């Protein structure tokens, strides 16, 4: 929140506020779409909101946004700030709830649907909007390979991998969750990686000196635990750590 979510959200609103002033000169033939239905995930609550809301408002649209169940308070606080800033009622609308509420937004009489989330849900939204005339934008999760060649600076590559896969506790749609290493340096790289993993600090995400904080909710913890337990192929390295009892 301190290093990414809040500062980047501020920059997005600043940028699109400038675009709003240049719309007539830079986009003379563009017109507002109308009502934009938007659904966002929980990994960057304010930044995901900014990506959806800022450009839509800048181009003269109104929005109906559904935040993730786990991070609704951020969006509700944003709505309160909009009211304090004088944004007219009905321009920014926040609706909370589970996936069924997201389906309501997709099926409603909106002019555009914007979704950030899983590929499986994105496919369902694409099918639901096909032939409807609604504009659609999808930003879907995937597997990003992290590739290490034999001429790489291995120490720097290890640090880069740590950032790629454990930044925000790995809760990033483009996290480097696949590692491909050139065979001549594979054993040395794996040894350096294991040593670095053993030094990762676990604790409160509010502590800036911590490497890995809490994930979003118990369901995610159970899912991750199941994936780790099911990974019996090949060599497995489990870095020792003391997990917090609470929080």
List the model feature ranges, each with a label:
Residues 3-6, 96, 109, 161, ...:
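A general structural motif at alpha-helix termini
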């Amino acid at each position: 929140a301190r290093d990414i979510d809040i500062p980047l959200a501020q920059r997005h609103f600043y940028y699109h506020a400038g675009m709003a002033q240049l719309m007539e000169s830079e986009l003379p033939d563009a017109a507002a779409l109308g009502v934009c239905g938007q659904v966002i995930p929980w990994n960057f609550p304010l930044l995901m909101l900014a990506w959806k809301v800022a450009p839509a408002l800048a181009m003269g649209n109104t929005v109906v946004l559904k935040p993730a169940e786990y991070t609704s308070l951020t969006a509700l606080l944003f709505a309160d700030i909009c009211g304090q800033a004088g944004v007219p009622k009905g321009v920014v609308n926040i609706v909370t709830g589970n996936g069924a509420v997201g389906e309501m937004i997709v099926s409603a009489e909106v002019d555009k649907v914007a979704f950030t989330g899983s590929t499986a849900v994105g496919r369902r939204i694409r099918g639901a909007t096909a032939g409807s005339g609604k504009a659609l934008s999808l930003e879907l999760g995937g597997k990003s390979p992290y590739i290490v060649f034999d001429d790489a600076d291995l120490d720097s590559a290890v640090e880069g991998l740590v950032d790629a896969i454990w930044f925000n506790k790995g809760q990033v749609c483009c996290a480097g969750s696949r590692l491909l290493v050139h065979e001549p340096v594979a054993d040395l790289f794996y040894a350096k990686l294991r040593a670095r993993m053993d030094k990762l600090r676990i604790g409160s995400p509010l502590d800036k000196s911590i490497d890995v904080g809490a994930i979003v909710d118990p369901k995610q913890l159970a899912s991750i635990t199941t994936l780790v337990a099911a990974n019996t192929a090949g060599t497995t390295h489990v870095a020792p750590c003391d997990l917090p009892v609470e929080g």
